[in-house]
Structures are given as C-alpha cells and as structure tokens.
UniProtKB/Swiss-Prot annotation:
Residues 1-28 form the signal peptide. Residues 30-59, 60-108, 108-148, 151-175 form the EGF-like domain. SMART domains: EGF. This is 24 kDa ookinete surface protein.
Amino acid sequence: MNFKYSFIFLFFIQLAIRYNNAKITVDTICKGGKLIQMSNHYECKCPSGYALKTENTCEPIVKCDKLENINKVCGEYSICINQGNFGLEKAFVCMCTNGYMLSQNICKPTRCYNYECNAGKCILDSINPNNPVCSCDIGKILQNGKCTGTGETKCLLKCKAAEECKLTGKHYECVSKPQAPGTGSETPSNSSFMNGMSIISIIALLVIYVIVM
C-alpha cells in the first residue's frame, strides 16, 4: 500500500516538473543557452555542441558509445540508454526522452507527430498541453491553424542595455549592439604602448628645453 502511494506521489511530482518546464516565458532563464522568440512562443536555443535536455536546460552532446555516457544528452530531447539485457550486453542507443518521439530524425513532442505547420513548428498549447498547435517563423502568421499567412510579429524579448533584438534566420534573439566606428576602446597592449610613447616624448621635450636654456 505504501509502495502504491509512493509511486503515485512520484508520478505527480514528475508531471508537475514537466508541466513547469514546459512554460517557457519571456522571463525564462535558459541554462547554457539563450532565449529566442518565434511568432507564438519562446524557446531556449543551445550553442553548437549542446542540446536541450529539458525545455530550459542545455547540456553538452555526448557520443552514445560507453557506459559513462548513460543518461547524458546525445541530441535534442534525447538521452543515451543501454538496451542490453540486464547489463550483460552493451547496446547503447540514443533515445527520445519521455513525452517525445522521433519524427524526421528529430525528437518532437509525441502529440506533434505528423502535425504539419508549413513555415513554423509544432508546439504544445501552453493552456492545454494535450493540444498541438503551430508557432510560425517570424514573417508568417497563423491562417486556418497553419503558418500560411504573411504578417509581422513584434519582438518582445527583454534584451540587455548593450544588446538589441534582431531577426536571425526565422526567429528573434538578443545580440550585441554593433560599435560605432572609432568608438571602440584600444587593446591593452596598444594603450600601454601609446602611454609609454607619450611619457618618452614629454621627457625628450624637457631635455631639449633644458639644453636650449
């Protein structure tokens, strides 16, 4: 009886964690990645060599070929597992995490299997996670549930003072503002060299002044 209640408790804990992770908002902090915006949703984008383990956490991608890489990220929403019989035989496989399945070589939410959006991607409805919906590429908008319309989407990302929101490919992201010509600071080595030359010039002028006087 205790085991039964423990199992139910763990099940709801996992469900709560998953539901919480699925809510990526404009205030979400992406661990190891950066927040991007499409037309209807936000998501975390990982740098090269990293992939999403959960909706807001990027981890290094490993090659699924040895025991120490078990349960580590081997692709987007996928982890390395050992399918060997009771550990006696090694059969390392990169498999989609719970709630995702392989579709066109990408781990997508199970509810999004074979759900086409045209110029966009399938995501789960933030209000009803059982419903697949389309989030369009920037420049496209929903039309009859698909990303077939043309329209503008305003960037709502909260970029830092030294950043600006920029359309990168098919999404918005915060990037560093370009420096105006001539406003960039000198490198430390150049600055030190120039300071040294200034001091030498001043000393030389003083010596010449003393000799002349």
